[in-house]
Swiss-Prot record:
GO biological process: translation
Protein name: Large ribosomal subunit protein uL18
Any Pfam family matching the protein: Ribosomal_L18p
Gene: rplR
Keyword Cell inner membrane attached: no
Job of this protein: This is one of the proteins that bind and probably mediate the attachment of the 5S RNA into the large ribosomal subunit, where it forms part of the central protuberance.
Basic residues bias: start-end ranges: 9-21
GO molecular-function term, one example from the UniProt record: 5S rRNA binding
GO cellular component, one term: cytosolic large ribosomal subunit
Region (Disordered): 1-25
Amino acid sequence: MSTLSRKQQTQKRHRRLRRHLSGTANRPRLAVFRSNSHIYAQLIDDEAQSTLCSASTLDKDLRSSLKTNCSSCDASVAVGDLVAKRAIAKGIQQVVFDRGGNLYHGRVKALADAAREAGLQF
C-alpha cells in the first residue's frame, strides 16, 4: 500500500469535486488555488471555457495595500473581497464555490467568507 503526498491528496480531492461542480455564465465557478506563498481566485464559465474575472495576491491593486506576508489569512480576505467586487461589477451575484481540493479551513475559508460578505452568494 503506497501513501500519497499532500499534493497528490489535494489533486485527488479536486478531481473528485470537479465531477459535480460546473459553472455557467449566470452562475460561474469560483475556483481557488492556494500555493505556499500566494492565493488565486477565478470566476470560470465552464460552458464557454473562459475566465470571467480573477484576483490574486499578485495583483497590483493588492500588492501596494498588503504590507505583510501574501500567504496570510489577511491577504486571502483581501483577495476574496476584490474578486467579489469585480464579479458584482460584471453583474454576477451567484457563484459555485470550488475549493480546489483544499480543505475548507484557514486561507480558503477566509477567502470564501470575505467574498460572501462583499455580496457573492454561494
